[in-house]
Amino acid sequence: MPDWTAINAALADAGHDVPAGASPRPVGGGDISAAWCLETSSGAVFLKTGPASSYDMFSAEAEGLEALGAPRVIRVPGVIACGTSGDSAFVALEWLNLGRTTRDAEARLGEQLAALHRSTAEAFGWHRDNTIGLTPQHNDRSDDWVGFFREHRLGFQLRLAADNGFTGALQEQGARLMKRLPVFFESYSPEASLLHGDLWGGNWACCDGDPVIFDPAVYYGDRETDLAMTRLFGGFGRAFYDAYESAWPLATGHRERNDLYQ
């Protein structure tokens, strides 16, 4: 069970005093962790709780949200607190009244995502590892995108598959693909763009008509990987892609690389 005494103390330290008698209310949105709404003196707070082993995941999420919010081009939930107590961990975020997406919001999201992707770094990766869902994501920095993607994305997924019994033809095909990776980048050298990292349709919504993104798996990489994720499960309309393309046109060969990244 969450240590609500410790959570309330952490919220108070962050300027969100919990009134006497206030109790957390279970809410949706915690597919991996338990999710709660708690009223405080500064407004409602969204909380995720889990075992102490969840702390690294929660703290990486908090740092990811702060990184995405730093350029001030796209809205993300504000981070209030993150910590552990005993055998439990938590992260507290700004409560946002999320609603349905609209075509106009999709277009603005496309423009804003392109602006976010213009925030770049000198190397691919990030200063720490994180998770995509429950799957570990390794982000050791590299100045070589092909090498980074081969080792920390494609290669890592193949090793996970092998550990789960998927061997034989899948591994052989994966090995051939890894050898062919440079072909996809013969005339394309991506910048190390700030990425959401897990931008599927369930990780964005609207608040007061404005697009909001959340539940990131942040790192610096090829911006086309974020777009490939948006196409994997749907949830993004033509207005989104048209607006992105208008703000920052994609390079030749992006359709082939989209298949690679998916």
Give names to the regions the model predicted.
Residues 20-21, 78-79, 252:
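A structural signal for short, hydrophobic beta-strand segments that form beta-sheets
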Residues 138-150, 155, 159, 188-194, ...:
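Active-site Asp-x-Gly
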